[in-house]
Amino acid sequence: MSLLRRPWVLVVGLLLIMSYVGAECEEEEKEYPSRYPIAYFEWENVKIPMTICLWLIGASIAKIIFNLIPHLNELFPDSALLIMIGLIIGIIFKLIGVNKNAFFLESEVFMLYLLPPLVFDAGYFMPARQFFDNFGSILCFAMIGTSFNIVAIALSLWAISLTGLFSVETPLMHMLLFGSVAADVDPVAVIVIFEELKVNEVLFIAVFGESLLNDGVAVVLYRMFLTFSEIGTENLITSDYINGGVSFLVVAFGGIGIGLLFAFLTSLVTRFARDEEVKVLNSVFILILPYTCYLCGELFGLSSIMAIVFCGAAMRQYCRENVDPDTVKATESFIKVLSLASETVIFVFLGLSTVSSNHHWDTSFIVLTVVFCLIYRTLGVVVMCYFLNKYRLNKYTKVDQFIMAYGGLRGAIAYGLVVAIPDFIPGKNMFVTSCIIVIYFTVFLQGITLKPIAEFLQVEKKNVHSKNMIEHIYSELIDTTMAGMEDIAGFKGHHWIRDSWNALNNNYLRPILVNKNNMKEMDKTKLVRKYKHLVDEDAKKIARGDLNSNMVFTKALIEHTRSRTNTMIDGVSSTSKIDFTKHMKENFGVTVYDDHSTVPMTPTHLFQETTEVEYSVRSEINDNDGFENDGYESDESGSFHERV
């Protein structure tokens, strides 16, 4: 009985029952009734969607239970826990004799259905300013660093294979194919851990961007080496190698191009879908068109990962301006739900597939693969940072370099690629086994130890300080000044690039892609718009705090406002006085009387005068953020005290 009370046992049991029912029912033959039944059990009609729903429910419940167990989430990453659950279920299935094909994750299912929500979520919510400010460094890590890792791992393993140490004889082209799998860094596993660490923005965006684009580069090279293997090494000629190199650039940057094209199309569609009857379709366009972009990338042999990443990053700005805020909020929440569900199912199936895959164990090959992955990952990061630091203002420290090298976790994408290797490759089963061990090593050992190591090395944390209005203004001023200085010096750096992009965006792209009415509202006065946004943010912060601590300041502010109001309103026409009084009342909660009189500043009147804006902000917070006065409530006198 004590065993049944353990949450992880219940999770395994739930997923086991769901999977076993799906596996057994698919083998049952259809029986014809001899009498008319009261009810039917038509499993075959709902087998596929029901199995998907059961897996999603079971895996999601597993994640909830993990978060309820004390200290479990602090010690193990979610990815490691989900893999363990899948591994346990897979072992049980094997012991009871369930057909392994019933719980094997096909590469087509992974690449076409589970992967797109993950990469779209990463691209759509990508911190665009930091990403494009560091785009040159990220591109170097992703393209040069990944290519170096692939070639170095492959050449090292191939050179050792010439000694006859490995049990399967593998040519160089097949080793390059496996190298493209082993060098692939999984953005899902990396991003989750680094978000928990709250590392500084420079380090986070370097790891985030590199892992995101690394997938696209690795997949492009994987397909190139796979095509070379299908042609046959002995049949390759010089033009094939030249075409392969050109194809690498065409596929990678073609994927970016098709992503930008679909971002343009999505923004254009949402611009015209503004009528009440059709604007509900905006959510459909925001979700379906990027997925269509991914499929078009697959259709034309381009990098579908880069396509959907850049589609999400480029369309977000325009879609948010075209679509009403409630629809945007609901759509973005649904994107997060899809991403979380895909991530959960992938890692559970990764554990299951450990048992269901065909394996070939070669200790020497596996150990050397792990060692070479660690060595060349570290070497690539150190060498790239050495050259990049010569041209960077914010340089990568030695601690940053260590965390970047140690944080190169492998995951689901590497597994999806290795199981997609054709059966005619002699070392496929050895590659699958080695890839799974590399994933386990990085997710479990490196993933578990990354947080304590980062704390021990005192990695610089992210600055959680929220900028106020004057800081935003100074930041904009510095950007504009730096762009002007670069222009005067004749140096075209990233400030000049950003300034040129803003000019192109404001003069040409936004008039085409953004609804004119929305653009007029947005462009009335940029300073006023920025000021209003920051005032709203400051008001929310004040509302979340104890109002009593702000009472003295609020009283002085109202006295100053009334004094200025009495001065400003003199000599103004009666119509203007009415408009001005209404404006002050609606926007600032300040009542201006015809005789310029003031309300006695008793605590009750002061509270009523000063909390009009705060109450509206509190209502907004309650509606949107689930905020409930931050643990405070007001009594009849109008003062706040801590809720008991």
From Swiss-Prot:
The record's region (Disordered) falls at 621-644
Query: What's an example Gene Ontology biological process for this entry?
Result: nematode larval development
Give membrane topology per the record: Multi-pass membrane protein
Where, by residue number, does the polypeptide cross the bilayer?
79-99, 108-128, 138-158, 174-194, 202-222, 245-265, 295-315, 334-354, 365-385, 430-450
Record's superkingdom? Eukaryota
Q: Which UniProt keywords apply?
A: Antiport, Cell membrane, Ion transport, Membrane, Sodium, Sodium transport, Transmembrane, Transmembrane helix, Transport
GO MF assignments: potassium:proton antiporter activity; sodium:proton antiporter activity
Asked if the record carries the keyword Protein transport, the reply is: no
Function in brief = Na(+)/H(+) antiporter that promotes normal di- or tripeptide transporter function, recovery following the peptide-induced acidification of the intestinal cytoplasm and maintenance of the peptide-dependent intestinal pH homeostasis. Regulator of free fatty acid uptake from the diet together with the dipeptide transporter pept-1. May play a timekeeper role in defecation cycle but is not necessary for pbo-4-dependent proton release. May play a role in the regulation of lifespan independent of the stress response pathway.
The name on file for this protein is Na(+)/H(+) exchanger protein 2
Source organism: Caenorhabditis elegans
Recite the lineage of the species.
Eukaryota, Metazoa, Ecdysozoa, Nematoda, Chromadorea
Gene designation? nhx-2
